[in-house]
Regions:
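Glycine-rich phosphate-binding/catalytic subdomain of phosphoryl-transfer
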Residues: 1-169
């Protein structure tokens, strides 16, 4: 129902249930572990990102949650970038911005996300991360993600039904 877990009583005191913005560097260890696996496996997407996974990107933060608060990881239906979540709230349509997916989640428009095998090598609990907790239509920058819902139109003082584009970093 799009409710962030931090809004639920059982997760109110759990830091990993809250938003982890780009500047969050708590997942340095997870980024290093993921990078070591990517290098050892010769992941072809890694050089596209400068040969090093950053703790500021999506998967190290998700992995940090899995390692330190597995109950949060298990309870989360979705993990997403803040911009994609805002667009979801505005339109009621879950989409992913190609900009965010490409930059923060190693998505390639022809090859997709990194393989299940990569994620399984990182941690068996991550094997199905894409299919289970990320999968949604990916839309290009400036592409229509949906239309503004009536409730959001009232809240924002805009017209219901106007087109809403994907987010951009």
């Amino acid at each position: 129902d799009k409710t962030p877990l931090c809004h639920l009583p059982e997760f109110k005191e759990e830091p990993h249930a809250y938003v982890k913005l780009w500047k969050h560097h708590g997942a340095e260890e997870e980024a290093k572990l993921m990078n070591d696996v990517a290098v050892a496996r010769g992941e072809e997407w890694l050089p596209t990102y400068g040969g090093k996974i950053s703790s500021e990107w999506m998967y190290p933060k998700i992995y940090e949650t899995l390692r330190h608060a597995p109950e949060v990881y298990d309870a989360a239906d979705r993990f997403m970038e803040a911009g994609d979540w805002i667009i979801w709230q505005m339109t009621g349509e879950e989409t992913r911005s190609a900009c965010c997916a490409g930059y923060k989640a190693y998505y390639h428009h022809e090859k997709g996300y990194p393989s299940k095998d990569f994620f399984k090598a990182v941690d068996p609990g991550m094997e199905n991360i894409v299919a289970d907790k990320l999968d949604a239509p990916i839309k290009g920058v400036g592409e229509k993600a949906g239309h503004l819902t009536a409730s959001m139109a009232r809240e924002m003082g805009l017209m219901e039904g106007i087109p809403v584009a994907t987010c951009i970093i």
